[in-house]
Amino acid sequence: MSTLQEQVRERALALGAPFGLVPDKVTVPIMSEDPESVKGLSVIARRLGAASFAIRLANALLVDEDDDETRATIRETSRNYGVDYDMTQREISLLHGDNTERDIEDVKGSEEAMAVVAWALNGGPAPVDPTKPSDIDAAHNVVIRGEHIQKLMEQAELVPQLEVAALIDLYRLYAEQGIGDQKLVRARRVALEWFLVRENDWLRIRF
């Protein structure tokens, strides 16, 4: 066990203590992944931008699945923003109207993952409370204020890798001990585990 691994676990336990995390019951191994393997700013910023546009479209389609005007608007604005090629296949299907109802629901269900990604770009407080939903509008506003992906990347600053690693470890521990709203815990883990893998589509990640 390295000193860095110990620091990650100690930080995770400290973050989770106010929410009932019990150190004596921990059996999840300390994360073996190197904190330096966390995705870089460019990849994270592009995922945030693409997800934000796709989620806004999903919300509109849940009201009216035949809202072609909003589809066209999001296609244009995401292209102008520079993230249309960063969308997952499921998100692209929403843009072009060849999606299923499940696709809409899945993209809508990515809101908490998007909020985690916004946090990683210093876009809000750390989502350490496993019972409190994130401020989704604040996450969208990180993208809106950017105006374009290049400006977003210039404005953004990644939180320290140790903090990202600690949050990954924390949510693995929350899942193990059944702490908090497990639907919320799982939704956030989608993004947290995505930070460590090469897969672009976070909805395809299994843990």
Give the label of every model feature segment.
Residues 2-207:
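Extended, charge-rich alpha-helical interface modules
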